[in-house]
Amino acid sequence: MRATISILGYNVFTGTSTLVSDKVGGDAYFGADDGLHTLMIDLDSFIGSIKIQASIVKTPTDDDWFNAEIAGTTFAVDTTGKVGTSVAINLDYTSAETSIKTYNTVGNFVWIRASISNWTAGIIKRIEINR
């Protein structure tokens, strides 16, 4: 069952530098096996760091979460001519970022959430996922 759901809605910086969203079901929660999750992150003058975290446990504790690799839209060519996609764990914004960007993460994740840290300014308009 493909669906677009909100991981994190409209949030304005209030002086708190960290925020963790509620968890949402990933592919494995719904029995899908391709593991493809497409993210859309909409920011307005945001300064901080965003991580997408995942768990493969049905009832996760704090220790069951890990940082998912996020494949961006930047491509690189290595010395053999192979074209690869850049992969990140953190999306770090050290100057005000206003953008809407898409990323992919792949894994048979039961749960997915967003973790925001070092937030010093701006707005997170939304973080959505299509699984």
Each model region followed by its residue ranges:
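Short glycine/proline-centered coil/turn motifs in the loop regions
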Residues: 44-46, 119
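Beta-strand signatures of extracellular beta-sandwich domains
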Residues: 49-53
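Structural beta-strand segments of beta-rich domains
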Residues: 35-39
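Beta-sandwich interaction modules
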Residues: 6-8, 19-34, 68-131
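Short, solvent-exposed secondary-structure boundary/capping segments
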Residues: 62-66
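Glycan-recognition and processing domains
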Residues: 1-17
